[in-house]
Amino acid sequence: MRTPSAKESAAIAAAAAALGLIFAGYSTYDYAQQLDRQVHAVHCSFIPGAPVSTEADNACKTALFSPYSALFRATWWGGVPISLFAFGAFTFFVGFGLYLALGARGSRAYSFYAVAGLAPFGASVVMFFISALHLHVFCKLCVGIYLSSLVLALAAAFGWWASRREAMEPVGTVPAGVPRAPRRAQRWGWVLLWLAALGASAVAPALAYVSGLPDYRSRIDKCGKLAVVGEPHNALLKIPTAHPTRAVLLFEDPLCPTCKVFHERMVDEGLFDRLEVTMAMFPLDAECNWMLDRSLHPGACVVAKAVLCGGNDQARAILEWAFDDQDELGELGKRSGDALASKITARWGPEIGACLGRPQTAARLNQQLHFAANNHIPVSTPQMFLGDKRICDEDTDLGLRYTLAQLAPEVLP
């Protein structure tokens, strides 16, 4: 079977880069859609151009809203999506692959392409392990970029090998237009020029992106304040943290997926342990929350009571356990409160289990709900107050680090 020539390998590499360019383009488009501070559907398919996903929660949305999707988040609202750098780099690799495929090029050009092709592959390996170890999901657009990078690296490396083999073949057996021998006199200046072109291609889209970003500073403190600062019954939780530098009040629902993502983001970015955390349970469950006419998260009242039963010292551990096992606990909550209580007792012991049914626990949860009502808290979670200032819902995800950099820079690690 005939092996591909150097030019054919370069063409394959260019095609792989073009596919990566498309995947990176859709990922960047989805990210840029969020800049109006609203929630939008995202693309999540291996087929370029497929319609956006209408699912409320999918792997691509998880990746997009993760701390790993962008750089310079403290400098610009939302930061600069890493897919922009991939978009620029893939553009270069498409162009350079065509440059090799359409003309007679020396071995040094192929060797540069092979070595440079390791850059997107290396970045893909890093992001693959982040997805596996931290996000626990694989975004299809991201996987498309990973595979494109792999094929690009392999094809570029094979093209280098083929160019060296062809350069050493006897005259008459070499395809037309291929150099007959290594061009040792080729100047290293070309390599520096190509390297500069790669760097410029990778950075240029990001520079264009940030130059077009609006100024969000005037918007981040326009979402109201606490009407009632203190809770008269001392019902709120005080969560111990390692290096508290700024007071924050959080309203959380332990079975709320958005609360889980929000909490994990703050922990992953090193923010949570730099906050002096006061927490109120705000379960979106009509069983105890009289502000609702139907339960959005059945069973959340029972789990919220478990968090309260843990007291200040155990509340965080129980809350994070609830976030980790949220799907299972949510299913148990839909079935019966008793099944959910049994699960909690099995994990946290009979003392916590007995506390769930005590009138004092129900009264404390009700006091926290009254505290929320007195402060006109929207019936959605999470809610975050920095001091007495409410952080806008739009600024608790992509814009969180930027908002804290503006309002509480001492919180940033």
For each of these PLM feature ranges, what is it?
Residues 179-211:
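Internal/C-terminal transmembrane anchor helices
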Residues 19, 249, 254, 260-342, ...:
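Structural alpha/beta surface segment adjacent to cysteine/selenocysteine redox centers
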Residues 8-35:
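N-terminal signal-anchor transmembrane alpha helix
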Residues 30-41, 122-150:
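Interfacial helix-loop-helix junctions of multi-pass membrane proteins
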Residues 80-102, 123:
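Hydrophobic alpha-helical transmembrane segments
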Residues 31-78:
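Extracytosolic (periplasmic/ER-lumenal) interhelical loops and adjacent juxtamembrane/interface segments
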